[in-house]
């Protein structure tokens, strides 16, 4: 509470100082006027990043993500305004600024050059918006629009990000999950939604799973590779800002449907999307709602090897794994945005988004453990599964939500915006089960002629598939619950000067909580012989002729997911239960409050050169 009071006291004192300076500069400042409006095209689509320039004052601004622009602190009179936008014909118009009032002036731009002999059809409005926003941004920024994302079959934001220069991604089952900016670790960059940092449901890092958010729920992706003073100072690599859909200038209805087929799972995929937006009450109230649903059954074949060197410097494979995955990912996402234009000087906004991803995974794994240079190893056969209520699969349910209320206000020359938001991320992994069998002292012939595809062949009497020679290594189940919540309040002020310079200042308070709870249990059957008999009677053969190219590797026989999921582990007459105490050391409850403030000054040195300086504490 003390930090919050200090932040507001700082803002009040600074605002009072600025207002005093304005009053000293001109006694009759109340007679100055403001022009505010929106840049749109002929179809009433907003144009963010448009350049608006007042020739008489040699100063200009750019329209924001919703196409709005504002010139304040203008002497009454007539001005010539030039508006330009890549791909559109420039417009020049005259406006008359009233004394002490705000003039609302929307500007309509038309398509650029028209060819008579050659007709080219296409929709590049979003691409133009992205180019203009990128061109007029003072920082090192990449902007990707919705229609650019729509050109590719990207199901989530992570897959869309990988097409931006300077971004590389980490994959999980063929989908981009974590984004890395300029080669830095994923937890050294920030991911925000509409400027608010997304909480992380990862237990030990700040990584945000980008595949949570469907690509069709985002209007614009902004990648800031340089963090300026008015942005949160918690990113070294850069900041990825996801801008959700804003209320349109006119009624908008859109629906999408798609399907596909995965050859590993041999199942069809489904993608659905819907968007509705309109304005009401003489365009004072804007509304847009969107929904997205994706169901993607998939799978993968995987081989993994760990190489070592012996005392003589000879390389050999120490760990040899063959894996078969079956994964179904279901995404649901809902968003809504409201804006209410109270009058020309005051506006209220609300934005909310909810994302849910259910990830059901079964994994069958064969491991040659502690493989030595002579080919001796222990064979491990493992099945990953879950309980019947979770489709006998490991369920990972991740959710993120962000709800923000904000306002934009104009007090003479001073503009202000504020935001109060609540965000939450969570991950649940109930009843995650592993059943692991082992067979020791097995011998293999190792073919290491191809370093990318080393191959192990069992010698006589050895095996790599589950049979009655194996014994139970371990049977485990774990429950995991991770939650992170953020409460934020921020206020930002901007004061333009007649010479084109701008002063920005503001403060922000963030209250964060994060909790992690993991319970991990090991189970031992009271009658191991009967348990092994039942296990061998409930197996599944994962041998597949298309497992890998040239049929070189095969997965083999495993305990089935149905059998693993049906085990009555809490039955004391069948199993002995023991909690693994070492796993409890990773549990925690954390609380954090961060109070920050900043100053930023944009100075126009020449027509083509600007200097940006800033301080953040």
Tell me the role of every PLM-derived stretch.
Residues 24-32, 36-45, 50-55, 84-88, ...:
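Short, acidic, small-residue-rich periplasmic hinge/interaction motif at the N-terminus
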Residues 267-367, 398-405, 412:
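Transmembrane beta-barrel wall of Gram-negative outer-membrane proteins
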Residues 158-197:
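Extracytoplasmic beta-strand/coil segments of soluble accessory domains associated
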Residues 190, 220-224, 239-245, 252-311, ...:
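Predominantly transmembrane beta-strands of Gram-negative outer membrane beta-barrel pores used
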């Amino acid at each position: 509470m003390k930090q919050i009071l200090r932040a507001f006291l700082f803002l009040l004192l600074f605002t009072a100082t600025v207002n005093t300076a304005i009053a000293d500069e001109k006694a009759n400042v109340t007679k100055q006027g403001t022009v505010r409006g929106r840049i749109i095209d002929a179809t009433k689509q907003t144009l963010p990043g448009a350049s608006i320039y007042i020739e008489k004052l040699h100063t200009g601004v750019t329209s924001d993500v919703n196409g709005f622009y504002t010139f304040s602190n203008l002497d009454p009179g007539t001005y010539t305004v030039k508006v330009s936008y890549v791909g559109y014909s420039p417009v020049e118009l005259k406006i008359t600024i009233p004394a002490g009032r705000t003039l609302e002036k929307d500007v309509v731009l038309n398509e650029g050059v028209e060819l008579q002999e050659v007709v080219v059809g296409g929709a590049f409005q979003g691409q133009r918006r992205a180019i203009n926003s990128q061109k007029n941004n003072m920082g090192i920024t990449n902007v990707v629009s919705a229609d650019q994302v729509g050109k590719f079959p990207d199901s989530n934001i992570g897959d869309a990000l990988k097409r931006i220069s300077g971004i590389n991604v980490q994959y999980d089952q063929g989908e981009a999950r974590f984004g890395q900016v300029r080669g830095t670790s994923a937890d050294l960059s920030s991911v925000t939604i509409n400027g608010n940092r997304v909480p992380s449901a990862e237990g030990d890092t700040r990584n945000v799973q980008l595949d949570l958010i469907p690509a069709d729920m985002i209007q614009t992706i902004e990648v800031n590779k340089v963090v300026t003073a008015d942005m949160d100072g918690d990113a070294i690599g850069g900041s990825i800002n996801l801008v959700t859909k804003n209320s349109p200038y006119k009624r908008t209805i859109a629906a999408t449907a798609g399907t596909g087929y995965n050859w590993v799972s041999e199942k069809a995929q489904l993608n659905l999307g819907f968007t509705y937006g309109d304005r009401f009450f003489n365009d004072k109230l804007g509304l847009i709602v969107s929904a997205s649903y994706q169901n993607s059954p998939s799978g993968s074949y995987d081989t993994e090897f760990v190489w070592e060197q012996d005392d003589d410097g000879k390389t050999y494979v120490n760990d040899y794994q063959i894996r078969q995955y079956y994964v179904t990912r279901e995404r649901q996402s809902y968003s809504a945005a409201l804006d209410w234009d109270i009058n020309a000087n005051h506006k209220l906004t609300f934005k909310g988004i909810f994302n849910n991803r259910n990830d059901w995974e079964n994994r069958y794994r064969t491991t040659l453990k502690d493989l030595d240079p002579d080919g001796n190893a222990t064979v491990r056969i493992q099945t990953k599964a879950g309980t019947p209520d979770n489709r006998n699969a490991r369920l990972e349910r991740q959710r993120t939500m962000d709800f923000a209320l904000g306002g934009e206000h104009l007090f003479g020359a001073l503009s202000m915006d504020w935001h109060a938001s609540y965000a939450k991320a969570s991950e649940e992994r109930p009843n995650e089960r592993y059943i692991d069998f082992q067979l020791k002292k097995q011998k293999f012939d190792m073919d290491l002629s191809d370093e990318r595809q080393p191959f192990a062949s069992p010698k006589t009497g050895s095996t790599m598939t589950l049979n009655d020679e194996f014994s139970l290594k371990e049977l485990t189940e774990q429950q995991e619950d991770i939650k992170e919540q953020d409460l934020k309040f921020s206020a930002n002020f901007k004061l333009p000067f007649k010479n084109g310079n701008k002063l920005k200042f503001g403060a922000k308070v963030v209250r964060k909580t994060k909790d992690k709870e993991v319970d991990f249990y090991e189970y031992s059957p009271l009658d191991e012989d009967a348990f092994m008999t039942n296990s061998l009677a409930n197996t599944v053969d994962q041998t597949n002729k298309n497992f890998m190219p040239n049929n070189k590797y095969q997965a083999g026989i495993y305990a089935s997911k149905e059998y693993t999921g049906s085990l009555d582990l809490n039955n004391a007459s069948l199993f002995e239960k023991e909690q693994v105490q070492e796993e409890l050391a990773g549990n925690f409850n954390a609380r954090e409050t961060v109070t920050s403030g900043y100053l930023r000054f944009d100075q126009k040195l020449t027509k083509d050169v600007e200097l940006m300086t800033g301080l953040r504490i």
